[in-house]
Protein backbone atom coordinates (compact mmCIF):
# COMPACT_ATOMS: atom_id res chain seq x y z
CA UNK A 1 0.00 0.00 0.00
CA UNK A 2 1.03 3.60 -0.58
CA UNK A 3 0.65 6.08 2.25
CA UNK A 4 -1.09 9.44 1.87
CA UNK A 5 2.26 11.25 2.13
CA UNK A 6 3.25 10.15 -1.40
CA UNK A 7 2.43 12.82 -4.00
CA UNK A 8 4.77 11.83 -6.85
CA UNK A 9 6.02 8.47 -8.12
CA UNK A 10 9.36 8.76 -9.91
CA UNK A 11 10.15 5.76 -12.11
CA UNK A 12 13.28 4.32 -13.66
CA UNK A 13 12.76 2.57 -17.03
CA UNK A 14 15.07 -0.42 -17.60
CA UNK A 15 14.26 -3.18 -15.11
CA UNK A 16 11.36 -1.17 -13.65
CA UNK A 17 8.74 -0.37 -16.31
CA UNK A 18 10.57 -2.07 -19.16
CA UNK A 19 12.53 -5.29 -19.72
CA UNK A 20 16.21 -4.91 -18.88
CA UNK A 21 17.02 -6.41 -22.28
CA UNK A 22 14.84 -4.14 -24.43
CA UNK A 23 17.46 -1.44 -25.00
CA UNK A 24 20.41 -3.78 -25.52
CA UNK A 25 18.65 -6.57 -27.39
CA UNK A 26 16.13 -4.58 -29.46
CA UNK A 27 16.98 -0.87 -29.69
CA UNK A 28 20.77 -1.00 -30.04
CA UNK A 29 20.71 -3.73 -32.73
CA UNK A 30 17.94 -1.85 -34.58
CA UNK A 31 20.07 1.31 -34.72
CA UNK A 32 23.13 -0.68 -35.76
CA UNK A 33 21.23 -2.45 -38.54
CA UNK A 34 19.49 0.66 -39.90
CA UNK A 35 22.16 3.34 -39.54
CA UNK A 36 23.49 3.07 -43.11
CA UNK A 37 20.07 3.30 -44.74
CA UNK A 38 19.13 6.24 -42.50
CA UNK A 39 22.36 8.13 -43.22
CA UNK A 40 21.95 7.63 -46.98
CA UNK A 41 18.42 9.02 -46.82
CA UNK A 42 19.23 12.01 -44.58
CA UNK A 43 22.90 12.66 -45.49
CA UNK A 44 22.28 16.19 -46.80
CA UNK A 45 20.06 17.33 -43.93
CA UNK A 46 21.44 19.96 -41.55
CA UNK A 47 20.76 17.69 -38.57
CA UNK A 48 22.84 14.82 -39.95
CA UNK A 49 25.60 17.18 -41.12
CA UNK A 50 25.93 18.42 -37.54
CA UNK A 51 25.93 14.88 -36.10
CA UNK A 52 28.60 13.78 -38.60
CA UNK A 53 30.69 16.81 -37.65
CA UNK A 54 30.28 16.03 -33.94
CA UNK A 55 31.16 12.35 -34.44
CA UNK A 56 34.48 13.38 -35.98
CA UNK A 57 35.34 15.24 -32.75
CA UNK A 58 34.94 12.08 -30.65
CA UNK A 59 38.43 10.88 -29.57
CA UNK A 60 37.58 7.31 -30.67
CA UNK A 61 37.16 8.50 -34.28
CA UNK A 62 40.91 8.63 -34.97
CA UNK A 63 41.36 5.32 -33.14
CA UNK A 64 38.69 3.77 -35.37
CA UNK A 65 40.16 5.23 -38.58
CA UNK A 66 43.55 3.75 -37.69
CA UNK A 67 42.00 0.26 -37.75
CA UNK A 68 40.85 0.62 -41.37
CA UNK A 69 42.75 -0.83 -44.32
CA UNK A 70 42.98 2.60 -45.94
CA UNK A 71 43.44 4.61 -42.74
CA UNK A 72 44.78 7.61 -44.65
CA UNK A 73 41.49 8.21 -46.50
CA UNK A 74 40.34 11.73 -45.67
CA UNK A 75 36.88 11.83 -47.27
CA UNK A 76 33.92 11.52 -44.91
CA UNK A 77 31.47 9.06 -46.45
CA UNK A 78 28.28 7.31 -45.40
CA UNK A 79 30.28 4.08 -45.22
CA UNK A 80 32.94 5.58 -42.93
CA UNK A 81 30.42 7.11 -40.53
CA UNK A 82 28.28 3.93 -40.59
CA UNK A 83 31.32 1.88 -39.64
CA UNK A 84 32.24 4.26 -36.83
CA UNK A 85 28.70 4.30 -35.42
CA UNK A 86 28.64 0.49 -35.39
CA UNK A 87 32.06 0.52 -33.72
CA UNK A 88 30.76 2.84 -30.98
CA UNK A 89 27.68 0.66 -30.43
CA UNK A 90 29.82 -2.50 -30.20
CA UNK A 91 32.14 -0.80 -27.69
CA UNK A 92 29.11 0.52 -25.74
CA UNK A 93 30.60 4.03 -25.88
CA UNK A 94 27.85 6.46 -24.91
CA UNK A 95 28.79 9.67 -26.72
CA UNK A 96 26.27 12.46 -27.31
CA UNK A 97 26.21 12.51 -31.15
CA UNK A 98 25.71 8.73 -31.17
CA UNK A 99 22.79 9.06 -28.73
CA UNK A 100 21.29 11.78 -30.92
CA UNK A 101 21.61 9.69 -34.09
CA UNK A 102 20.23 6.58 -32.39
CA UNK A 103 17.24 8.64 -31.23
CA UNK A 104 16.49 9.73 -34.80
CA UNK A 105 16.75 6.15 -36.11
CA UNK A 106 14.52 4.86 -33.32
CA UNK A 107 11.95 7.62 -33.94
CA UNK A 108 11.83 6.48 -37.55
CA UNK A 109 11.29 2.88 -36.42
CA UNK A 110 8.57 3.75 -33.92
CA UNK A 111 6.72 5.95 -36.41
CA UNK A 112 6.85 3.22 -39.08
CA UNK A 113 5.52 0.63 -36.62
CA UNK A 114 8.68 -1.48 -36.75
CA UNK A 115 9.43 -0.71 -33.11
CA UNK A 116 7.20 -0.86 -30.02
CA UNK A 117 8.42 0.28 -26.62
CA UNK A 118 8.30 -2.67 -24.23
CA UNK A 119 6.46 -2.13 -20.96
CA UNK A 120 5.47 -4.83 -18.47
CA UNK A 121 1.83 -5.94 -18.41
CA UNK A 122 1.13 -4.26 -15.05
CA UNK A 123 2.40 -0.82 -16.10
CA UNK A 124 -0.69 0.69 -17.76
CA UNK A 125 -3.06 -0.45 -15.00
CA UNK A 126 -0.70 0.95 -12.35
CA UNK A 127 -0.33 4.27 -14.20
CA UNK A 128 -4.13 4.56 -14.43
CA UNK A 129 -4.62 3.72 -10.75
CA UNK A 130 -1.98 6.17 -9.57
CA UNK A 131 -3.26 8.99 -11.79
CA UNK A 132 -6.87 8.36 -10.74
CA UNK A 133 -5.71 8.50 -7.12
CA UNK A 134 -4.25 11.97 -7.65
CA UNK A 135 -0.58 11.04 -7.93
CA UNK A 136 1.81 12.61 -10.42
CA UNK A 137 4.12 10.29 -12.36
CA UNK A 138 7.59 11.20 -13.59
CA UNK A 139 10.37 9.29 -15.37
CA UNK A 140 14.10 9.42 -14.56
CA UNK A 141 16.36 7.47 -16.90
CA UNK A 142 19.89 7.65 -18.27
CA UNK A 143 18.30 7.49 -21.72
CA UNK A 144 17.47 10.88 -23.22
CA UNK A 145 14.07 12.47 -22.64
CA UNK A 146 13.37 12.08 -26.37
CA UNK A 147 14.10 8.33 -26.20
CA UNK A 148 11.93 8.00 -23.07
CA UNK A 149 8.99 9.64 -24.83
CA UNK A 150 9.31 7.24 -27.76
CA UNK A 151 9.20 4.18 -25.48
CA UNK A 152 6.06 5.37 -23.68
CA UNK A 153 4.44 7.08 -26.67
CA UNK A 154 4.69 3.95 -28.83
CA UNK A 155 4.51 1.29 -26.12
CA UNK A 156 3.19 -2.25 -26.28
CA UNK A 157 0.28 -0.95 -24.15
CA UNK A 158 -0.42 2.06 -26.36
CA UNK A 159 0.37 5.73 -25.76
CA UNK A 160 1.19 6.13 -22.06
CA UNK A 161 2.51 9.70 -22.27
CA UNK A 162 -0.75 11.28 -20.99
CA UNK A 163 -0.12 9.60 -17.61
CA UNK A 164 3.34 11.18 -17.24
CA UNK A 165 3.86 14.71 -15.89
CA UNK A 166 7.64 15.03 -16.25
CA UNK A 167 10.74 13.40 -17.74
CA UNK A 168 14.32 13.63 -16.47
CA UNK A 169 17.60 12.36 -17.90
CA UNK A 170 21.27 12.84 -16.97
CA UNK A 171 20.97 16.60 -17.57
CA UNK A 172 19.81 16.75 -13.92
CA UNK A 173 22.81 14.63 -12.85
CA UNK A 174 23.82 10.98 -12.70
CA UNK A 175 21.48 8.45 -11.17
CA UNK A 176 23.72 7.38 -8.29
CA UNK A 177 24.32 10.95 -7.07
CA UNK A 178 22.23 12.50 -4.30
CA UNK A 179 22.16 15.96 -5.90
CA UNK A 180 20.31 14.59 -8.96
CA UNK A 181 17.31 13.72 -6.80
CA UNK A 182 17.45 17.07 -5.00
CA UNK A 183 17.34 18.74 -8.44
CA UNK A 184 14.36 16.59 -9.47
CA UNK A 185 12.44 17.41 -6.27
CA UNK A 186 13.05 21.13 -6.88
CA UNK A 187 11.91 20.83 -10.49
CA UNK A 188 8.75 19.00 -9.39
CA UNK A 189 8.20 21.61 -6.63
CA UNK A 190 7.63 18.72 -4.23
CA UNK A 191 9.25 18.00 -0.87
CA UNK A 192 11.59 15.00 -1.28
CA UNK A 193 9.79 12.97 1.42
CA UNK A 194 6.62 13.10 -0.72
CA UNK A 195 8.35 11.42 -3.69
CA UNK A 196 8.64 7.63 -4.09
CA UNK A 197 11.39 6.44 -6.43
CA UNK A 198 11.06 3.00 -8.07
CA UNK A 199 14.22 1.42 -9.51
CA UNK A 200 16.03 -1.91 -9.91
CA UNK A 201 19.45 -0.50 -8.90
CA UNK A 202 20.30 -0.36 -5.16
CA UNK A 203 22.90 2.40 -5.69
CA UNK A 204 20.20 4.61 -7.21
CA UNK A 205 17.82 3.86 -4.33
CA UNK A 206 20.59 4.80 -1.86
CA UNK A 207 21.20 8.12 -3.64
CA UNK A 208 17.48 8.91 -3.68
CA UNK A 209 17.11 8.16 0.04
CA UNK A 210 20.18 10.31 0.80
CA UNK A 211 18.27 13.18 -0.85
CA UNK A 212 15.23 12.51 1.34
CA UNK A 213 13.09 10.53 -1.12
CA UNK A 214 11.48 7.19 -0.37
CA UNK A 215 12.68 4.31 -2.56
CA UNK A 216 11.64 0.76 -3.44
CA UNK A 217 13.56 -1.82 -5.47
CA UNK A 218 11.88 -3.74 -8.32
CA UNK A 219 13.05 -7.35 -8.61
CA UNK A 220 11.56 -8.15 -12.02
CA UNK A 221 12.28 -11.41 -13.83
CA UNK A 222 15.66 -11.06 -15.54
CA UNK A 223 16.92 -8.25 -13.29
CA UNK A 224 20.35 -8.59 -11.68
CA UNK A 225 20.20 -10.62 -8.44
CA UNK A 226 20.47 -8.69 -5.19
CA UNK A 227 23.01 -9.42 -2.46
CA UNK A 228 21.84 -10.36 1.04
CA UNK A 229 22.86 -6.90 2.27
CA UNK A 230 20.87 -5.22 -0.51
CA UNK A 231 17.84 -7.33 0.37
CA UNK A 232 18.07 -6.41 4.04
CA UNK A 233 18.54 -2.68 3.40
CA UNK A 234 15.74 -2.21 0.85
CA UNK A 235 12.03 -2.74 0.48
CA UNK A 236 11.67 -5.06 -2.53
CA UNK A 237 8.66 -5.78 -4.75
CA UNK A 238 8.20 -7.93 -7.87
CA UNK A 239 5.70 -5.70 -9.70
CA UNK A 240 3.51 -2.63 -9.25
CA UNK A 241 0.35 -4.48 -8.14
CA UNK A 242 1.17 -4.07 -4.43
CA UNK A 243 1.49 -0.29 -4.72
CA UNK A 244 -2.16 0.60 -4.28
CA UNK A 245 -3.13 3.97 -2.85
CA UNK A 246 -4.54 3.77 0.68
CA UNK A 247 -7.84 5.60 0.30
UniProtKB/Swiss-Prot annotation:
Substrate binds at residues 141-142, 175. The keyword Cytoplasm applies. CDD domains: HAD_EP (cd01629). GO terms for biological process: L-methionine salvage from methylthioadenosine. It catalyses: 5-methylsulfanyl-2,3-dioxopentyl phosphate + H2O = 1,2-dihydroxy-5-(methylsulfanyl)pent-1-en-3-one + phosphate. The keyword Transport does not apply. It is found in: Cytoplasm; Nucleus. Its EC number is 3.1.3.77. GO terms for cellular component: cytoplasm; nucleus. SUPFAM superfamilies: HAD-like. InterPro entries: Enolase-ppase_E1, ENOPH1_eukaryotes, HAD-like_sf, HAD-SF_hydro_IA, HAD_sf. One of its GO terms (molecular function) is acireductone synthase activity. It is an enzyme of class 3 (hydrolase). Its main location: cytoplasm. It comes from the Eukaryota. Mg(2+) binds at residues 12, 14, 200. Its cofactor is Mg(2+). Keywords: Amino-acid biosynthesis, Cytoplasm, Hydrolase, Magnesium, Metal-binding, Methionine biosynthesis, Nucleus. Binds 1 Mg(2+) ion per subunit. Bifunctional enzyme that catalyzes the enolization of 2,3-diketo-5-methylthiopentyl-1-phosphate (DK-MTP-1-P) into the intermediate 2-hydroxy-3-keto-5-methylthiopentenyl-1-phosphate (HK-MTPenyl-1-P), which is then dephosphorylated to form the acireductone 1,2-dihydroxy-3-keto-5-methylthiopentene (DHK-MTPene). Monomer. Belongs to the HAD-like hydrolase superfamily. MasA/MtnC family. This is Enolase-phosphatase E1. It comes from Drosophila willistoni (Fruit fly).
Amino acid sequence: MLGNEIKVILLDIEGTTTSIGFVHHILFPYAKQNVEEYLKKEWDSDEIKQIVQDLQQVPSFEVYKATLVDSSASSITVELITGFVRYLIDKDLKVTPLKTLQGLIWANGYESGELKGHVYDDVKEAFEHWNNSGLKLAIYSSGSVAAQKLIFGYSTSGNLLPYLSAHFDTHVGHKQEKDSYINIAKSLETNPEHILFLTDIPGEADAARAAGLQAIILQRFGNAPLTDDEKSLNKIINDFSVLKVDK
